[in-house]
Amino acid sequence: MEPVSSWGNTSLVSVDPEIHDLIEKEKRRQCRGIELIASENFTSFAVIEALGSALTNKYSEGIPGNRYYGGNEFIDEIENLCRSRALEAFHCDPAAWGVNVQPYSGSPANFAAYTALLQPHDRIMGLDLPSGGHLTHGYYTSGGKKISATSIYFESLPYKVNFTTGYIDYDKLEEKALDFRPKLLICGGSAYPRDWDYARFRAIADKVGALLLCDMAHISGLVAAQEAANPFEYCDVVTTTTHKSLRGPRAGMIFYRKGPKPPKKGQPEGAVYDFEDKINFAVFPALQGGPHNHQIGALAVALKQANTPGFKVYAKQVKANAVALGNYLMSKGYQIVTNGTENHLVLWDLRPLGLTGNKVEKLCDLCSITLNKNAVFGDSSALAPGGVRIGAPAMTSRGLVEKDFEQIGEFLSRAVTLTLDIQKTYGKLLKDFNKGLVNNKDLDQLKADVEKFSASYEMPGFLMSEMKYKD
């Protein structure tokens, strides 16, 4: 049999130089590029160290103190520590809130919450995808095709933003809810640049007898730092990913109310919340098997980092940087949805320029700027959207401040101008447009400027001096 020292204690570069080389190339891409995808961030070396630890070896189906496998005494300690840190990071009273830290990521967390709270074909309402919502909130196309499992297994009716202002139309939301009578009302989104009126959501939910769930995946870091409105004041359940503005590993959490319910007309005296057992059962055994303990350990590290004064400074800077970028683009005459932002992202409406998000995303990719095409309210297709979504968390993690984001705005303006020039010369069809991207000196110059700019900032998670590909 092959000795352990041969297969089990040999470095990656020796065992699999091909994968090692691709990882090094990805490091270079991250270091030399400008990362503007709003759902991405750069996590810390400490988090990465926990992710690559021996915790990945252990199975631990069940919850601390009630496992289906032995040998979990330290895994139980880690998960309990992660849960207590999660409640502390989000300023939750442990007597009033519980949390499950086992979901593999945000979409599984959402579906586990729905499975716990609803019966198949119960009614839900979430923000429409072109209005800034998320697939898991019940999205289906204008033609009625059900895209998300949420819309397949539950009856979904979206609410929307006002097409003039870009803000959520709470009056129409209430009107729809009174007609539709959902069992669950969802607030939260993936491309909504404004804060959420949780008090209004609560009032609407109470009017129609619905539970209120917040998906704070995008803004959880801002919520933890108290730089965004607090969903825990009004919601019954709060879900989140952990790798976006929270700057942790890729994982998910479900927070739920527990203990006595506040007195309410028509409610039995002494009523208590019954979410805990339902949510724990939905996560396991209903939808998942063994938790990913390396993720839970890494999440515990990230939550410890999130509960520091330095993280609050970071979250505040994320918002300031997003505002600075939005203001710069508007100063150049570009159309920004809602005329600005109150959180970590800017949604740029390209339709007045006659461009699609696909083309701008593709050209930016070739210039080492990473952002994503995104639907804008009024779009008929998420596959050919009229905007791009731009986020501040990742580059803020590298130490950039407002003036740096104004420079990023200048790069983006150059990219859009170049996209317009190529479209004018080669045509609107994507196959024709792509021809203008080949051997383009202006594009090459923009890429060189972007990479020179980005390489001057530090990189979390790994040492640039130890990279294989430095140039």
From Swiss-Prot:
Subunit record text: Homotetramer. Interacts with UBP16.
Compartmental location: Cytoplasm
Recorded metabolic or biological pathway in which this protein acts: One-carbon metabolism; tetrahydrofolate interconversion
Lineage, broadest ranks: Eukaryota, Viridiplantae, Streptophyta, Embryophyta, Tracheophyta
Species annotation: Arabidopsis thaliana (Mouse-ear cress)
GO function terms (MF aspect): glycine hydroxymethyltransferase activity; pyridoxal phosphate binding; salicylic acid binding
Primary subcellular site in the record, as a coarse category: cytoplasm
Gene behind this protein: SHM4
Stated regulation of activity: Inhibited by the antifolate drugs methotrexate and pemetrexed.
Keywords assigned by UniProt, alphabetized: Acetylation, Cytoplasm, One-carbon metabolism, Pyridoxal phosphate, Transferase
Catalytic activity: (6R)-5,10-methylene-5,6,7,8-tetrahydrofolate + glycine + H2O = (6S)-5,6,7,8-tetrahydrofolate + L-serine
Family from the record: Belongs to the SHMT family.
Matching NCBIfam families: PRK00011.1
Residue positions, PTM N6-(pyridoxal phosphate)lysine: K244
Tissue expression: Mostly expressed in flowers, less abundant in roots, inflorescence stems, and siliques, and barely detectable in leaves.
InterPro entries for this protein: PyrdxlP-dep_Trfase, PyrdxlP-dep_Trfase_major, PyrdxlP-dep_Trfase_small, Ser_HO-MeTrfase, Ser_HO-MeTrfase-like, Ser_HO-MeTrfase_PLP_BS, SHMT-like_dom
Name this protein carries in UniProt: Serine hydroxymethyltransferase 4
Residues annotated as binding L-serine: S39, E61, Y69, H218, K244, R389
Cofactor(s) for this UniProt protein: pyridoxal 5'-phosphate
Record PTM N-acetylmethionine, positions in chain: M1
Binding site for pemetrexed: S39, Y59, E61, S105, G106, S107, H134, S190, H218, G290, R389
EC number(s) per entry: 2.1.2.1
Gene Ontology process terms (BP): circadian rhythm; glycine biosynthetic process from serine; tetrahydrofolate interconversion
Physiological role: Catalyzes the interconversion of serine and glycine with the conversion of tetrahydrofolate (THF) into 5,10-methylene-THF.
Gene Ontology cellular-component annotations: cytosol; plasma membrane; plasmodesma
